[in-house]
C-alpha cells in the first residue's frame, strides 16, 4: 500500500446516473487545487470500462444505478483495483445498507445531502488514511453489531493476534492515522500498513469497517 504524500493531487472519478448531481459534485470540487476529476460514468459497467484506462485514487459511487448498481460494482472494483478507495454516495441512510457496504469494502459512506466540505474531507481522508468514519457510518456499524449474531464466518475462532497487532487494531478503532499509530508503537508507517493488511487477512475482513466490527465482537474495544 502506498504511503501517500499529503500534498499530492488526488485523482477522483464519479459514477452516478444523474448528470445534474455529477455536475454539482464536480463543480463543488473544482476550486480544490489538490483534487482532479478524471472520469465520470452513469453506471457501474461504464465505470469499470473507464477504469481499464484511467486509474483514479478515489471513486465516488452511487448505489442505485441502471445496468450495474453500486452494490455489484463495489466488489468488482475492490477485486480488480484494490488500491482504489471507494466512497459510497447515496440517498440511502438505512443502517443495514451502510454497514453492508462498509463490510464489503467501502472506504466511507456519505449521503447525497452531504455538503461539499464533507465530501472533500472524506476524499482527503480515505486517500491518506484508507478510511473515513462519520456519525452515520459509526451508528450504522454499531447498530449492525447489536443486531447481527456473531458467526464463525464473521469472526473466526482460531484467530491468533500478537500483542502488537492487538495494540494497532485498538488504535485503528480510535481513528488514529497511520502516522499517529506509527509514532505511538515506534514503527514505520509502512510497517503499520503491512500489519493492517495482515490483520485483514487473519480476521477474514475486507475493510477497516470489517476490522472495527471484528474488534468489537472479539471484545477488544467497547461499544458506545
Residue ranges of model-derived segments:
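Conserved acidic segment of CheY-like receiver
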Residues: 8-21, 25-29, 59, 161
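Helix N-cap/capping motif at the beta->alpha junctions
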Residues: 30, 40-49, 70-72, 207-210
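Active-site beta3 strand of CheY-like receiver
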Residues: 54-60
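Active-site residues of response regulator receiver
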Residues: 62, 90
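Receiver (REC) domain active-site loop signature in two-component systems and cognate sites
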Residues: 65
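Short, flexible helix-to-coil linker/hinge segments that flank and couple to helix-turn-helix
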Residues: 96-103, 107-108, 113-163, 167, ...
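Helix-turn-helix DNA-binding segment
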Residues: 154-191
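Basic, Lys/Arg-enriched C-terminal extension of HTH/homeodomain DNA-binding domains
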Residues: 197-224
